[in-house]
Amino acid sequence: MDPVLVLVLTLSCLLLLSLWRQSSGRGKLPPGPTPLPIIGNILQIDVKDISKSFSYFSKIYGPVFTLYFGPKPTVVVHGYEAVKEALDDLGEEFSGRGSFPIVERMNNGLGLIFSNGTKWKELRHFSLMTLRNFGMGKRSIEDRIQEEASCLVEELRKTNGSLCDPTFILSCAPSNVICSVVFHNRFDYKDENFLNLMEKLNENFKILNSPWMQVCNALPAFIDYLPGSHNRVIKNFAEIKSYILRRVKEHQETLDMDNPRDFIDCFLIKMEQEKHNPRTEFTIESLMATVSDVFVAGSETTSTTLRYGLLLLLKHTEVTAKVQEEIDHVIGRHRRPCMQDRTRMPYTDAMVHEIQRYINLIPNNVPHAATCNVRFRNYVIPKGTDLVTSLTSVLHDDKEFPNPEVFDPGHFLDENGNFKKSDYFMPFSTGKRMCVGEALARMELFLLLTTIVQNFNLKSFVDTKDIDTTPMANTFGRVPPSYQLCFIPR
């Protein structure tokens, strides 16, 4: 046998033995398939449909099991009861952010999504309060979304009812809402800076969704030595941060401490208030990372949901017709939809919820981590262990949602046609790490979808039975297949 191969195998075995001793000494991990040296269970997992693999392993090992993505163990939680117990009942213990080496390399542990400890708690509290205050300000977030919805309608009218790919236009609207909240102004859809920002965000989202990213995250030691699209992600992120820094400097020059205009102003004021605190988490570097996180989390996820939602409405014409009937009855054709309308529109509300449930946008959540040694069911999860929660197993639970693979707003309606809440509805996750922008995203989805369907009929040149709604292969988020449609003014 080749001496080099012998050396590699020997070192791999020693590494696994060391990890096993370390984990067995500190805790009792759940059962799982036997990992291979270095690569762990990667060959046993369908990286194009990880949720399917999780479902398979849950039938063998139960709702809590261990997989090795590379040499590091990850505890997987499957099913509503186990997910709720982990994220709600043990929310503090599992409030750490799991490892994501590519992102960690870009933001150095800063920002809102991938930070930990005191840093994360302070940034999360600040962001929640800031967004809440904007919702109650002179110009509320709802006003900004309504303005963007009107601009979106005008852009769609410019298509003149011709066949078009809606990807770009539907990406612009949520991104512009974020721009309004963060930068104080929206952009024209043809603005050069806006187009460049959109291009970088869209490209990064696609790359981060690729199976290659799963390999990079499982084997981070090899990142620096491998060519590949991960290098493009790092470059794009640097350019996004550079643009954000330019906007921050503009804000610094015009800042009025008594009249904050947007998220950046509020952050700069907080920095000034804490300038004598040597341990402050509010720095320029932290601001850039946080704003970048707000863009990534608040634009791509919402635009993908919109795009997927229109595809489902294009296929299920009977649902679209019922929504339009309810809109015509409650709002009419000429008044702008507002959030107060939602309580009088149970079918439309159910439709928006069903889109989110059905598409299951982030099927396996963003990884969590144990902040201490955690006793979870019959196991002891060592501090620092990554935890992955299967949101698919909750959103597609066949007991809560009969025929979960079928798109049916009836999943959220009672026998009298009233809207019916469900504890299983957790597309924004649950617990301490629940999405900060949930309220904003819910508002955007209701107002933008309702405004589009109020103003346009959706038409496809493909027979509805032939419209494919199967998501494209990905690892992190579910993306709809490419499609074209016509927006016919009503």
UniProtKB/Swiss-Prot annotation:
Keyword set includes Secreted: no
A Pfam family the protein falls into = p450
Q: Where found in the cell?
A: Endoplasmic reticulum membrane; Microsome membrane
The record's comment on protein family reads: Belongs to the cytochrome P450 family.
The answer, when asked if Metal-binding is one of the entry's keywords, is: yes
Task: Tell me one GO molecular function of this protein.
Answer: iron ion binding
Top-level lineage group:
Eukaryota
Function comment: Metabolizes arachidonic acid mainly to 19-hydroxyeicosatetraenoic acid (HETE).
Q: According to its UniProt record, which reaction does this protein catalyse?
A: an organic molecule + reduced [NADPH--hemoprotein reductase] + O2 = an alcohol + oxidized [NADPH--hemoprotein reductase] + H2O + H(+)
EC numbers on record = 1.14.14.1
Q: What is its main location?
A: endoplasmic reticulum
| Protein name per Swiss-Prot or TrEMBL | Cytochrome P450 2C55
What is the membrane topology here?
Peripheral membrane protein
The cofactor(s) it depends on are:
heme
Q: What GO terms fall under cellular component here?
A: endoplasmic reticulum membrane
Q: Which UniProt keywords apply?
A: Endoplasmic reticulum, Heme, Iron, Membrane, Metal-binding, Microsome, Monooxygenase, Oxidoreductase
Expression is induced as follows: P450 can be induced to high levels in liver and other tissues by various foreign compounds, including drugs, pesticides, and carcinogens.
Species per Swiss-Prot/TrEMBL record: Rattus norvegicus
The UniProt annotation places heme binding at: C435
